[in-house]
């Protein structure tokens, strides 16, 4: 890979980074890195649309007027040699241990697991979670802890709402949750999740559904959703309905400052708030259904 690459850094806060990343990834068909100051993505200088800058500025302008009124999204551009880009990009994505025994590992990396490790094979792509984001790590750690707490029994059934890359569903199946359903209303997310489920040999262990949580059938011992605060509030009644009696709901994608709003919405529908986990500005809320 000897051509040049265009590196684009977009400054944005953590409360909007997922939305900005998803919009840009969908438009340009690229992988997006989450960084402390915002997001970064790359375009092949040889094949990038000639009007990529106009397209980018239009997206950012629209997001700052309609989606997030008053917000601004400044960006900067750098040029990288092909070899530098390839090496740097792969250097950024190394095997990532989350919790005690979950390891998210890119397919190009060789990894010698420790006893008891469960390997999630997943390459970065199209802005969906690969374990780098704090909320994904919070959810993975919670799933592992829940599976350990259930021993010697199996941890029960699980529904992953807004599955994205499918990483939480794959982790759940590896940890012994059964049956596992995963649902997403974004067609691209469903495509990516299907690829990752197959990559991990989990086609028979995970039922993947296209649509909203309403497409899920039954009630689950665990409902997990790593989305955002506002959508979580909007779908509260549906997620409460899908949580089995004595079951747990684990909700993330929530800024710490938004935690009380989400907690109130689910408490008002009868769920009992239990624990809150935090990582940086983000939190995971755990509820139990009586």
Swiss-Prot record:
Q: What is its main location?
A: cytoplasm
The GO terms this record gives for MF are: protein-lysine N-methyltransferase activity
The cellular location(s) given in this protein's UniProt record come to: Cytoplasm
What the entry lists under Pfam families is as follows:
PrmA
Q: Which SUPFAM superfamilies match?
A: S-adenosyl-L-methionine-dependent methyltransferases
Keywords on record: Cytoplasm, Methyltransferase, S-adenosyl-L-methionine, Transferase
Residues that bind S-adenosyl-L-methionine: 136, 162, 184, 226
Which GO biological process categories is it annotated with?
Answer: methylation
Task: Name any GO cellular component annotation.
Answer: cytoplasm
The catalytic activity, as recorded, is:
L-lysyl-[protein] + 3 S-adenosyl-L-methionine = N(6),N(6),N(6)-trimethyl-L-lysyl-[protein] + 3 S-adenosyl-L-homocysteine + 3 H(+)
Q: What is its EC number?
A: 2.1.1.-
InterPro entries in UniProt: Ribosomal_L11_MeTrfase_PrmA (IPR050078), Ribosomal_PrmA_MeTrfase (IPR004498), SAM-dependent_MTases_sf (IPR029063)
What protein family does this chain belong to? Belongs to the methyltransferase superfamily. PrmA family.
Checking NCBIfam families in the record gives: prmA
* Family matches, as HAMAP family: Methyltr_PrmA
Q: What does this protein do?
A: Methylates ribosomal protein L11.
The protein depicted here goes by the name Ribosomal protein L11 methyltransferase
Protein species of origin: Syntrophobacter fumaroxidans (strain DSM 10017 / MPOB)
Q: What's the name of its gene?
A: prmA
């Amino acid at each position: 890979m000897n051509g040049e690459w265009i590196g684009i850094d977009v400054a944005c806060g953590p409360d909007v980074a997922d939305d900005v990343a998803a919009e840009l990834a969908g438009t340009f068909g690229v992988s997006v890195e989450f960084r402390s100051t915002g997001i970064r993505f790359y375009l092949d200088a040889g094949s990038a649309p000639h009007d990529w800058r106009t397209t980018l500025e239009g997206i950012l302008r629209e997001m700052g007027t309609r989606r997030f009124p008053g917000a601004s999204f400044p960006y900067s551009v750098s040029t990288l040699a092909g070899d530098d880009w390839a090496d740097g990009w792969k250097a950024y994505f190394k095997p990532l241990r989350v919790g005690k025994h979950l390891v998210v590992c890119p397919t190009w990396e060789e990894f010698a697991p420790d006893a008891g490790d469960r390997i999630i094979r997943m390459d970065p792509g199209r802005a969906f979670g690969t374990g780098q984001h704090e909320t994904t790590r919070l959810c993975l750690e919670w799933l592992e802890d829940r599976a350990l707490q259930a021993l010697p029994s199996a941890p029960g059934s699980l529904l992953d709402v807004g599955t994205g890359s499918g990483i939480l569903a794959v982790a759940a199946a590896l940890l012994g949750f059964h049956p596992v359903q995963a649902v997403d209303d974004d067609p691209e997310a469903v495509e990516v999740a299907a690829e990752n489920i197959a990559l991990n040999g989990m086609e028979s262990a995970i039922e993947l559904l296209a649509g909203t949580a309403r497409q899920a059938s039954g009630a689950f011992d665990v409902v997990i959703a790593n989305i955002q605060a506002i959508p979580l509030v909007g779908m509260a009644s549906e997620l409460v309905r899908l949580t089995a009696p004595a079951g747990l709901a684990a909700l993330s994608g929530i800024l710490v400052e938004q935690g009380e709003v989400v907690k109130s919405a689910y408490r008002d529908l009868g769920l009992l708030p239990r624990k809150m986990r935090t990582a940086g500005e983000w939190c995971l809320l755990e509820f139990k259904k009586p």
